[in-house]
Amino acid sequence: AETLKNKIPVPKKVPVTFGDVTDDLLKGVDILSGDTLMLELANYYRPHYSIFIMDYPGVFDGDPADSNSRIYPLVNSDIATKLRDQSHASQTIDVTGGLIGKIECALEMSKVSETWITNLGALSGFFDGKTSGSRVLI
């Protein structure tokens, strides 16, 4: 059986798994977000696709557990502002930037790469040209 590993030559893919605690010349120790790593790699390699994988199949307009919530098929700066305002209202803290940090990096990445936010189940479709999730455009 052909796997994703066999379909794409290693030099053509750059997996990014997660951020980590790192040394920082100014701060001593800091968090290096996996989203920031993706942004830097996308700016350098300029891939066709940049795909953020998360637990949900895209960016939702509300709580993903709520059956009334829907996926935004397109996330732009207006949607990002709306979600940022909602995030500030909930006062949830995530040192890695959470969804808002991911969207902000994705917006920048969309200048150099077709950028998506989706889940692991949708990933293989991208290799066959079947995109799904939330497309991010600046």
Question: Where are these predicted regions, by residue range?
Answer:
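C-terminal catalytic "cap/lid" subdomain
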Residues: A1-I138
